[in-house]
Curated annotation (Swiss-Prot):
The lineage of its organism: Bacteria, Pseudomonadati, Pseudomonadota, Gammaproteobacteria, Enterobacterales. TesA is a multifunctional esterase that can act as a thioesterase, lysophospholipase and protease. TesA functions as a thioesterase specific for fatty acyl thioesters of greater than ten carbons, with highest activity on palmitoyl-CoA, cis-vaccenoyl-CoA and palmitoleoyl-CoA. TesA also possesses an arylesterase activity towards short acyl-chain aromatic esters such as alpha-naphthyl acetate, alpha-naphthyl butyrate, benzyl acetate and phenyl acetate. GO terms for cellular component: outer membrane-bounded periplasmic space. Its EC number is 3.1.2.2, 3.1.1.2, 3.1.1.5, 3.1.2.14. Protease is stable up to 50 degrees Celsius. This is Thioesterase 1/protease 1/lysophospholipase L1. NCBIfam families: PRK10528.1. CDD domains: Lysophospholipase_L1_like (cd01822). The gene is tesA. Optimum pH is 7.5-8.4. Stable between pH 6.1 and 12, however, below pH 6.0, thioesterase rapidly loses activity. Pfam families: Lipase_GDSL_2 (PF13472). It is found in: Periplasm.
Amino acid sequence: MMNFNNVFRWHLPFLFLVLLTFRAAAADTLLILGDSLSAGYRMSASAAWPALLNDKWQSKTSVVNASISGDTSQQGLARLPALLKQHQPRWVLVELGGNDGLRGFQPQQTEQTLRQILQDVKAANAEPLLMQIRLPANYGRRYNEAFSAIYPKLAKEFDVPLLPFFMEEVYLKPQWMQDDGIHPNRDAQPFIADWMAKQLQPLVNHDS
């Protein structure tokens, strides 16, 4: 009869490899670093699109929503190191800058902050995903153009995916908007979750 200890020693490297593979698969986390558009403004976090996306993906990828209503890019940057350490994400979706624009920050300032965010994400061996942000038309053409240009510039500079702004789809349905004309309401969240799943699917290697 084969000695049990010998069998265990023979299988130990294989078991160790299986364990590492399982842990790697279980560790795939998408961290969403955003503002009120992703935080679920005036609704419970469980009703917001990141939670619905997490439900949709089930165990394929864990979606951690670290979005806070009102956050500027600078505030997001300040929170990022602790989030990276705590969650050790594989991907970080950066949905920030809207509050910078609404407060009239200089586009160069927002650009530099977002650049630092992308640098920090890459330094943590995570993959940044950048979302295009656009401002209401009443902020003026010159400011809007300078602000909107930040995102493709940084996406090219860091060679990272640039996701379309999901609000451009939501704006087409007035019944999906809150009274402030800025934030999507609860009825819009399932659509956003499905739309984001389609955008993210080729980036995280999902079938749905």
